[in-house]
């Protein structure tokens, strides 16, 4: 039986689900950029790409060389293709304007070019997260500068989302709003090949992912929930749980997507003015879309993440996502 490449899958989606051709082309361009990033990541010290740039991004985080390189790869791959009205990235303060010499399209691309990059130097899996939105009609004027407001849409408006994970294999996880598919990069063929069909997150779990070193800074509902997990079979939940924490959202969520579990990045009392650590537009929204499409759930503790109306491009949010039963339990604790 012939293998299904990403290109073939997208063509079949156009035929069976009326996926627009320009969206198909956009996903293929993003996938090609991810292959290039994967190649750069795999070289490590041999490619001279480890270490920091000595600069900070808009969040005040030190930029790694690969952060900047990955950002440039995604911008250059997508700016000329004619599918996008604009782009936004974790590494840029403001939206990226499509150069006037290129045609513009109907979509917006938002991305974290290299999630988990603080782990690069220690050879831990990292990845690229992306979200695709439709550009509102009022912002489609070819001559106008695209404003940030065009991007400020709730996650429910996403038309596609995905992430590439650069680990022992390079994989692309993708949703077009009708389930989640997983593609593995065949390095000899040079193509992403469908290897995981109709991915589903188990409703209950025996694993959780959270940075326990911050426990003293959590809100009471999170402390209560984690204490119940740690109580094991003798506790109120009646079973033993294992904890996993990689400190790379892509890697942690990928494990939960394929094995089940709950990922938590709660608010922190050390920064009470911030509603969370992770960014809504290009981390929480695409991951929540993927998790929900796989049968899981995602909230900020009190509200479904995909229902949140963004107020700014780099807005932060608390995140609880994964197996539906566990996410509903901790969300219930927040509402008590």
Swiss-Prot record:
A molecular function GO annotation: fructose 1,6-bisphosphate 1-phosphatase activity
The entry's keywords: Carbohydrate metabolism, Cytoplasm, Hydrolase, Magnesium, Metal-binding
Localisation per UniProt entry: Cytoplasm
Pfam families for the chain: FBPase, FBPase_C
Reaction(s) the record says it catalyses: beta-D-fructose 1,6-bisphosphate + H2O = beta-D-fructose 6-phosphate + phosphate
InterPro entries in alphabetical order: FBPase_C_dom, FBPase_class-1, FBPase_N, FBPtase
Subunit record text: Homotetramer.
Protein name listed in UniProt: Fructose-1,6-bisphosphatase class 1
Lineage: Bacteria, Pseudomonadati, Pseudomonadota, Gammaproteobacteria, Pseudomonadales
